[in-house]
Amino acid sequence: MGGLEPCSRLLLLPLLLAVSGLRPVQAQAQSDCSCSTVSPGVLAGIVMGDLVLTVLIALAVYFLGRLVPRGRGAAEAATRKQRITETESPYQELQGQRSDVYSDLNTQRPYYK
């Protein structure tokens, strides 16, 4: 085992655990239940299958993520910023104080006192 890589050791561990205990796993508290017993080999197979499936999903996400184009570069960001400054603002510019707009409101004020 000294020459194996750490990844190989991880994959070998469930296999060794399955081989070491070949008798079925039984519940000690409930010996008369109608449950089916699961052997250590089946448990190791489930764990190994789960690990393999997880690695496959991670690899698929990684490779599919590499197919998507990267974010915009600095040149495109500069053009976008320039395009934003060139567009006209949809908001009206602020003007000085205009008293004629609200002058009719002052005539109604005495009614609200």
UniProtKB/Swiss-Prot annotation:
Its main location: membrane. Changing R23C: Found in patients with early-onset Alzheimer disease; uncertain significance. The chain crosses the membrane at residues 41-61. Keywords: Calcium, Cell membrane, Disulfide bond, Immunity, Membrane, Metal-binding, Phosphoprotein, Signal, Transmembrane, Transmembrane helix. Residues 87-113 have a biased composition (Polar residues). Residues 75-113 are annotated as: Disordered. The record marks T54 as: Important for interaction with transmembrane receptors. GO terms for cellular component: cell surface; membrane; plasma membrane; secretory granule membrane. Changing G49L: Does not significantly alter the formation of homotrimers or homotetramers. Homodimer; disulfide-linked. Homotrimer; disulfide-linked. Homotetramer; disulfide-linked. Homotrimers and homotetramers form when low levels of partner receptors are available and are competitive with assembly with interacting receptors. They may represent alternative oligomerization states or may be intermediates in the receptor assembly process. Binding of a metal cation aids in homooligomerization through coordination of the metal ion by the subunits of the oligomer. Interacts with TREM1. Interacts with TREM2. Interacts with SIRPB1. Interacts with CLECSF5. Interacts with SIGLEC14. Belongs to the TYROBP family. This is TYRO protein tyrosine kinase-binding protein. It comes from Homo sapiens (Human). The lineage of its organism: Eukaryota, Metazoa, Chordata, Craniata, Vertebrata.
